[in-house]
């Protein structure tokens, strides 16, 4: 392009037909004027319709119709110098080699002007088109040409069609790059009454259109958007995710809009001219969806009210409900770039206060929450991270997110004031305090003499305090040393860890140790409830023989002052003697039919008959057919067949479901009191029959020989079981692997699972 002498010449390359157009002659033919303003040529012509075709030697063809034809030519980047309002031009566009400005002053007329300039050999760097805003007074029209710049050298020109309405400003955006044209008109209207001012403030208006453009309102006048409904609502971005059109508006003073309310214009209404006109008349341009949102942090409510006048607006990006975060880009919404507008006006504060008052009284306030009014008008509660201010829709997501802050997780809730011990468990903290008491037993009184002692608990969003009162807890003392603790479980572990060597016979239930097996056997009765010792004078029963002697001596001794006339019993109290006489003289109305035993009620008599005189065991085991007197005994026995071996020997890998069997195992295998030794293998035994049975293994003779097969053994009980289970008809269910017989199929199945499980697998 060359400029000089007040003329503008357009020249083609040497390989093409030369086309020359004198601008002054062209303008004069249109009854217009042209002048030079600095580096630009300003052309003014009456408002008309101009269509540019391919220029030949015949000249220029004019058509006063309203249609625009497309002429192929290189893309031109256009820059507009704005007179009335400021225009933001991206820096990338300023690097273009060519910029053309046209200032068209209109006369009175209703036509539309479309101008095109044809050029050749114009090479500009590939850039992105820019949208400029041009405004002017009434009766004056200014036009902006926008094209998508590319590096194509072929002569291509895209003509544009501009629709003019009775508005002050307008901008036309033509999508390039092969995308079907979608015209979005941004229209601003001023109020008729200048005295009436909107009480709402201006907020950033974000629109995600088909090509991802961002339009920003620069003035103080509210914006209305009318979008072409022919385009798809959902597109895909560079990451393959869906991009949704989102428009966020501020509410105007005359709009009766509720926070969280939405307004949707259907496609049918959009295609109807009356519906669109009605929306325009009501100062509401059509849009697919308008969302009024507000976010409020309850902890910042008072600060927002105090800073309300100097803080006009604030924006935060938040995840929409139902969307997920990418693992690498946690703060990015892969579905759409949605923004929430935070309104700090007094009206919004009132709405948020009403929402907060409806909160349940019993709800904990340990977690900070933010109230979000969603698109459906319902309040949504999110949980913000107090470290990075991210928000989550549940406490579980917040806890999972807190793992990204390892420095915070390293902090412990409880810290000892006497040392550097820290922990997150309250029980461990108390146990640690007790360790200080054991170490500094001299200072035991000083440990709890203070009225209160406070330990700070640092929670993620609040601070609580743990108060220890001066009341001493109940202490459990070890009978073998000076150890004491407030928990029985700690004492049991202490006995196992410290005193297990001195007291090898340890109870599997409570961990208490004993020196002799008889002591352990006597102690086990306290857990099972067995009372084998019964008083011969009364119904008293006990688990220890010494307790029975004490009872007889104290209740039935010969030196007691009150003696019974009917029996040799004596009592130390007259009331006890009278109670005995009442029972003896006829209050025991339930007489046992088998003996002289009498009971005061039928249940006691039934228990006596079952336990003493009945050889029948009504409660039978379904697996081994063993009978029991009571259902509780049967239930305890059934655990053996269920395979729940919860009792394990602490000396070896032996496990059993019966604590008595475990005690017998410990006594027979792991006790040091094994005085009977085998002379050949030096193995010890507690009883003579066990040693005698063991000695048979060294003779080499199988004294028990089966007469039906080649089976032989030194164990009489084993030989008896062999004959009954293998060679009798009482066991019809035979094992397929060892030919052992069983009475029931369940016994056979249990045998196979126990002895032939590897064969099955």
UniProtKB/Swiss-Prot annotation:
Compartments in which it is found: Nucleus
MF terms (GO), sorted A to Z: sequence-specific DNA binding; zinc ion binding
Keyword tRNA-binding: no
Keyword match Metal-binding: yes
Intrachain disulfide bonds: none
Chief place of localization: nucleus
Signal peptide: none
Keywords: DNA-binding, Isopeptide bond, Metal-binding, Nucleus, Repeat, Transcription, Transcription regulation, Ubl conjugation, Zinc, Zinc-finger
Any one GO cellular component localisation term in the record: nucleus
Gene Ontology terms: biological process: positive regulation of DNA-templated transcription
UniProt note: domains: The sixth zinc finger contains a Phe residue, Phe-584, instead of the final His residue normally found in C2H2-type zinc fingers. There is another His residue a few residues downstream, His-587, but this is not involved in coordinating zinc. Despite the His to Phe substitution, the zinc finger retains the ability to bind zinc using a tridentate metal-binding site of Cys-564, Cys-567 and His-580. The zinc finger also has hydrolytic activity against 4-nitrophenyl acetate.
Subunit structure of this chain's protein: Interacts with PHF8.
Role description: Transcription regulator required for brain development. Probably acts as a transcription factor that binds to the promoter of target genes and recruits PHF8 histone demethylase, leading to activated expression of genes involved in neuron development, such as KDM5C. May compete with transcription factor ARX for activation of expression of KDM5C.
Family, as annotated: Belongs to the krueppel C2H2-type zinc-finger protein family.
Name of the protein in question: Zinc finger protein 711
Organism: Mus musculus
Taxonomy of the source species: Eukaryota, Metazoa, Chordata, Craniata, Vertebrata
């Amino acid at each position: 392009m060359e400029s000089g002498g007040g003329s503008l010449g357009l020249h083609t390359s040497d390989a093409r037909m030369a086309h020359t157009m004198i601008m002054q002659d062209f303008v004069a033919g249109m009854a217009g004027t042209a002048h030079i303003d600095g580096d630009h040529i300003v052309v003014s012509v009456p408002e008309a319709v101009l269509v540019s075709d391919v220029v030949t030697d015949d000249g220029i063809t004019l058509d006063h119709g309203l249609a625009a034809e497309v002429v192929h030519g290189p893309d031109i980047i256009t820059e507009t110098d704005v007179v009335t309002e400021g225009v933001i031009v991206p820096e990338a566009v300023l690097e273009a080699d060519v910029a053309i400005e046209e200032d068209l002053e209109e006369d009175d007329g209703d036509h539309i002007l479309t101008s095109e300039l044809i050029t050749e050999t114009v090479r500009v760097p590939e850039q992105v088109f820019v949208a400029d805003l041009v405004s002017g007074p009434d009766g004056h029209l200014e036009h902006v040409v926008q094209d998508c710049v590319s590096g194509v050298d072929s002569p291509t020109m895209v003509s544009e069609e501009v629709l003019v309405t009775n508005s002050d400003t307008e901008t036309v955006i033509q999508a390039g790059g092969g995308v079907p044209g979608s015209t979005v008109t941004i229209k601003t209207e001023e109020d008729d009454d200048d005295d009436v001012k909107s009480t709402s403030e201006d907020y950033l208006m974000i629109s995600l259109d088909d090509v991802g453009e961002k339009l920003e309102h620069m003035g103080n006048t509210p914006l209305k958007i009318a979008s072409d409904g022919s385009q798809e609502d959902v597109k895909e971005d560079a990451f393959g995710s869906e991009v949704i059109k989102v428009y966020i508006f501020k509410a105007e003073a005359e709009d009766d809009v509720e926070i969280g309310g939405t307004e949707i214009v259907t496609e049918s209404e959009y295609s109807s001219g009356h519906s669109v006109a009605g929306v325009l008349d009501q100062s509401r341009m059509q849009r697919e969806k308008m969302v009024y949102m507000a976010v409020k942090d309850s902890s910042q409510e008072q600060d927002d009210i105090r800073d309300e006048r100097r803080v006009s607006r604030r924006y935060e990006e938040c995840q929409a409900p139902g969307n997920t975060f990418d693992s690498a880009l946690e703060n990015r919404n892969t579905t759409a770039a949605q923004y929430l507008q935070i309104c700090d006006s007094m009206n919004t504060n009132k709405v948020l206060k009403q929402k907060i008052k409806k909160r349940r009284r019993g709800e904990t306030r340990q977690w900070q929450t933010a109230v979000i009014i969603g698109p459906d008008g319902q309040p949504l509660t999110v949980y913000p991270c107090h470290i990075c201010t991210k928000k989550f829709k549940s406490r579980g997501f917040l806890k999972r997110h807190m793992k990204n802050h390892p420095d915070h997780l390293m902090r412990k809730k409880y810290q000892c004031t006497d040392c550097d011990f820290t922990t997150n468990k309250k029980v461990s903290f108390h146990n640690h305090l007790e360790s200080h008491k054991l170490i500094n037993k001299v200072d035991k009184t000083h440990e709890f003499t203070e009225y209160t002692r406070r330990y700070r608990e640092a929670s993620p969003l609040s601070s609580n305090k743990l108060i220890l009162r001066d009341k001493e807890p109940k202490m459990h003392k070890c009978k073998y040393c000076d150890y004491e603790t407030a928990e029985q479980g700690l004492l049991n572990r202490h006995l196992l860890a410290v005193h297990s060597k001195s007291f090898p016979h340890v109870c599997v239930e409570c961990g208490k140790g004993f020196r002799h097996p008889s002591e352990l056997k006597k102690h086990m009765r306290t857990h099972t409830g067995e009372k084998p010792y019964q008083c011969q004078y009364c119904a008293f029963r006990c688990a220890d023989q010494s307790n029975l002697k004490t009872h007889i001596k104290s209740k039935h001794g010969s030196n007691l002052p009150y003696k019974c006339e009917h029996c040799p019993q004596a009592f130390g109290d007259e009331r006890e003697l009278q109670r005995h006489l009442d029972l003896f003289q006829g209050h025991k109305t339930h007489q046992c039919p088998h003996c002289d035993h009498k009971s005061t009620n039928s249940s006691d008599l039934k228990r006596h008959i079952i336990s003493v005189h009945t050889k029948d065991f009504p409660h039978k085991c379904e697996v081994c057919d063993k009978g029991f007197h009571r259902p509780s005994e049967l239930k305890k026995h059934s655990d053996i067949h269920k395979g729940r071996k919860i009792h394990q020997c602490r000396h070896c890998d032996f496990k059993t479901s019966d604590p008595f069997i475990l005690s017998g195992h410990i006594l027979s295998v792991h006790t040091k009191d094994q005085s009977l030794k085998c002379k050949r293998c030096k193995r010890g035994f507690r009883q003579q029959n066990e040693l005698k049975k063991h000695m048979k293994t060294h003779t080499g003779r199988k004294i028990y020989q089966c007469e039906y097969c080649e089976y032989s053994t030194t164990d009489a009980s084993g030989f008896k079981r062999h004959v009954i289970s293998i060679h009798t008809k009482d066991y019809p269910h035979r094992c397929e692997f060892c030919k052992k017989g069983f009475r029931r199929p369940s016994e056979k199945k249990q045998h196979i699972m126990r002895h032939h499980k590897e064969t099955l697998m």
